[in-house]
């Protein structure tokens, strides 16, 4: 969330940012935040004065008694003070709740390089890498191809779990694991620490990682425990150091998470009922960085470069897209998507999301870094995240881009060492 000190000092920046996001409702919230914050600070001063007066009255009563004066008026005043203080405390508590409610929902401040646009149709293509191959035969649907060859079973998964699930079998299961190992080896070699996070998070932690009001509809909730199955390893890695203070010498902290991801809501395009693109459960290798504020834009480009390296080595054509103001969401200050070429759809589709969240998550999670030259000085650190590979979508890319005319699927060369040298599925 935004730091109240920033909103207080720069309301014009917040308002201008909301204008760029075309969010009329939240524009009205800024005045409410400022009014309630002002009320809280005024009543804080007032209560400090009332408490000081209470202490002064005690001294005056003693003086009156010594001088033989009647202290009854002072007793009456002293008796009224606790009620006044409590009334102010109650108003302050409500003001604090209102300020936090809106701050938790106001979006991050966008970087100046985020393009203006109304929705995903106005995202800006930054570059394209690789050339989609020309085909003189009709590609088979990846789901039907996988099912026909015994590499996946969608029908039995629907019986056991419902639509949007799948069994991976045989060499396709091994290919999924090969993708995981290849991505992990690539990222670990760059100094990232591998992390297997908890696959569930409690509500409090989830509320502080993301806007749960928006995100909750896509998540699986465990009712009795007030917990959620994770939608991405980003979330537990972000919450891992909540309420802690880093030393500057320990940053950047670079991690790569390995986890299943669980999503209830599949998206505007609906379920991929016989396929691997939009599903309820998938494995994802996720990059995550905590860093000093002045390093975060450099780190953002590093995360993107890492993901690009993986898809380039896999030989999959892709493009990088700078997400526009109307499509970027609440948490990121800037976000790139990588979209891989899907021949059956004859279009690029999202396979990687790469975000710089600046201080937005660290403010929510109360994660700070101590100044190396001033022990008492602390500031919010920055957090960043990026997909390395989501295996279900990468599998679809391979099944389509490496499919041969006779229905075989060539295994990308970089994955063959993880497949005991196998060249075709």
Swiss-Prot record:
InterPro entries: aa-tRNA-synt_IIb, aa-tRNA-synth_II, aa-tRNA-synth_II/BPL/LPL, Ser-tRNA-ligase_type_1, Ser-tRNA-synth_1_N, SerRS_1_N_sf, SerRS_core, tRNA-bd_arm. It catalyses: tRNA(Ser) + L-serine + ATP = L-seryl-tRNA(Ser) + AMP + diphosphate + H(+); tRNA(Sec) + L-serine + ATP = L-seryl-tRNA(Sec) + AMP + diphosphate + H(+). ATP binds at residues 263-265, 279, 350-353. Pfam families: Seryl_tRNA_N, tRNA-synt_2b. Keywords: Aminoacyl-tRNA synthetase, ATP-binding, Cytoplasm, Ligase, Nucleotide-binding, Protein biosynthesis. Pathway: Aminoacyl-tRNA biosynthesis; selenocysteinyl-tRNA(Sec) biosynthesis; L-seryl-tRNA(Sec) from L-serine and tRNA(Sec): step 1/1. It is found in: Cytoplasm. It comes from the Archaea. Consists of two distinct domains, a catalytic core and a N-terminal extension that is involved in tRNA binding. This is Serine--tRNA ligase. It comes from Methanocorpusculum labreanum (strain ATCC 43576 / DSM 4855 / Z). The gene is serS.
